[in-house]
Amino acid sequence: MPISDAMWRKQSGVSLQKRGARALFSSAYPWLDMLEPWNFWDPTTVKNATRNLAFADEFISAKLVEDVVDYEVSDAVVVNLGPSPMVTGAEHPAIVPPWKSTWLKGGRIKSAERAALIKVVKATNLGGAQFRGWDWLGNRIRSFPRDTPLFISAQDEIGQVSVDPRVFTNEAAVSTAQQTFTLKLNLWWSPGDTDCFIHNEHPFLEVHTQIHGLGRMQKFTERDQSTLYEDVVMPIGYSHDPFCRVTGHNQWTYPWHRYYADTDSVWLAVELHP
């Protein structure tokens, strides 16, 4: 019999023995066994530890929440920043897979190891990002096109995460070679109809999540937009699958790819650095 939300709250109190709680919820929701790598049943863990991310400001609400249990979300894109599934919902719990995201409005994160909650709260003059400490990418890459308005926020180093690179890239279903990475986040901003530069060089694993506006992640056979062969539409709250493949120890091969902003857009970069 499904467990109601009220019963969930009652039964998940710290007075329950961990083993009893585990058995109770696993019988009702078998997929909870997937959460074994992260023990959110431990009552000694500080739940819902929250802080602002480095790029939070009056225009963008951006929070990191760790050891998440029954966390209410009024309106935000929620990104699962861990190798274990995130559980959302109340009467009808649902899974957000590792490194994926959803858009919650009056929703709840029932359990997660680590999550980012991000929303543009003030769209007017959002394009003034360069005057709020964001950096034009051409200041960092000499070869970057001088006429491309692509801006990067401050980067936030979140902490360490252990994951098998081939599981991250969907090349393997079972972890056989876990590795520790440093998890880093930053935002990007571009106005509509911006070509954000075709490239294929990254010394890290990455995925992206759309926070505001509409864009696309695109793949090419050559560094030429006429060779487009895959067009991944990015609506708000969407995270694409990893583009790279593991080709050696700390070696990732990316296809030629770019982000294209259809409208004024803000998107999140999730980077795993070896």
Residue ranges and their predicted role:
Residues 85-107, 222-258:
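Short acidic-glycine-tyrosine-enriched beta hairpin
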Residues 114-123, 253-274:
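A short hydrophobic beta-strand segment most commonly corresponding to one strand
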